[in-house]
Amino acid sequence: MKAHFGVTVWLGVCCSMTLLMVVIGGITRLTHSGLSITEWQPIVGVVPPIGDEAWLREKEKYAQTPEYRHRAADISLDDFKRIYIIEYIHRLFGRALGAVFCLPIPYFAITKRINRAMVAKLLMVALLGGMQGAMGWFMVKSGLVDTPRVSHYRLAGHLFLTILLFSILWHSFLRCAGVRSTTTTTNARFFTAAAVVGLTVLQMVLGALVAGLDAGLTYNTFPLMDGAIIPQSLFSAKLWHGGFLHDVTAVQFLHRLVAVLIVVCAAPLPFWLKTRGAWLFLACVALQFLLGVATLVSVVHIFLAAMHQVFGFVTLAAGVHMLCRLRREGSTCISGHAGIS
């Protein structure tokens, strides 16, 4: 039995908006627009600057940032407006997504279209959404102090919260849409499939570290790095003393290594599980791998990089869908009507 049609559509819209938010966030980062707005004003920040005087005030605030001093000291007002508008759209769309998600919850709860367990789950998602907004500002603040870029650790945390939010929303949508656990498989194969999906999440977080360090701008060949599969600089004592995850070479190598590991581990899944979901997941993994290579050799072309980022979420969605279709030996079938009373 499926959940109320309106609830299913609403969750589908929220998932779609989250993916679009990922695209906008990626473009914001790739165009170096994220530090153009130097204040966090959740309410009054809805209104953009109006008139040249207001724009000049915003540009003066931007002039106090490390990014301006190191990278954009000669930026014109028109160019500043361009990067400001990109970040403004990023923040405004985040507010819109929050409203679209939060406002219908009381209505669905009062009209009994969702049960208490689903209400609690959705309120947890709303709380995570608030944390995501705060984490976004916490990330931006790291680029307003000393260095002209945000902390790659905070960027990874920002992305991880998005991954968590999207996964919960997508799983809820699948259950409300009537997706059921219909294919029985062994515990070993089920947990192997789950581990590959977990590796996908790890790889997405590693991608955020790569992006935060601008590591994609170096070693723009594949499969070799500086003429070798394993670059010699990985064996440098300086690297290990300075911090492995602070090093551009180490982080990019890890990202490459996990990408290959995911492909190798995902390849046998369709033959083990014998489901269309496993084939879809493998196809997404393969395409995402090719997008990653294309992004690297293009020296992070904006379109390819944005597609690579959002397709990571598409691959994750395919993985969650694959797992939702599986039932372990000895377990009872999980019905697809979570969310209704």
From Swiss-Prot:
EC number: 1.17.99.9
InterPro entries to which the protein is assigned, alphabetical: COX15/CtaA_fam (IPR003780), HemeA_Synthase_type2 (IPR023754)
Keyword Iron assigned: yes
Protein's cellular compartments: Cell membrane
Cofactor(s) of this protein: heme b
Domain of life: Bacteria
Membrane-spanning segments: 7-27, 92-112, 118-138, 159-179, 190-210, 253-273, 280-300, 302-322
Molecular-function annotations in GO: metal ion binding; oxidoreductase activity, acting on NAD(P)H, heme protein as acceptor
Membrane topology note: Multi-pass membrane protein
The entry's keywords: Cell membrane, Heme biosynthesis, Iron, Membrane, Metal-binding, Oxidoreductase, Transmembrane, Transmembrane helix
Binding site for heme: H255, H308
GO CC terms in record: plasma membrane
Reactions it catalyzes: Fe(II)-heme o + 2 A + H2O = Fe(II)-heme a + 2 AH2
Biological-process GO terms, alphabetical: heme A biosynthetic process
Protein's UniProt keywords contain Zinc: no
Pathway membership, UniProt: Porphyrin-containing compound metabolism; heme A biosynthesis; heme A from heme O: step 1/1
Function: Catalyzes the conversion of heme O to heme A by two successive hydroxylations of the methyl group at C8. The first hydroxylation forms heme I, the second hydroxylation results in an unstable dihydroxymethyl group, which spontaneously dehydrates, resulting in the formyl group of heme A.
Family: Belongs to the COX15/CtaA family. Type 2 subfamily.
Subunit text: Interacts with CtaB.
Protein name (Swiss-Prot/TrEMBL): Heme A synthase
Phylogenetic classification of the source organism: Bacteria, Pseudomonadati, Pseudomonadota, Alphaproteobacteria, Rickettsiales
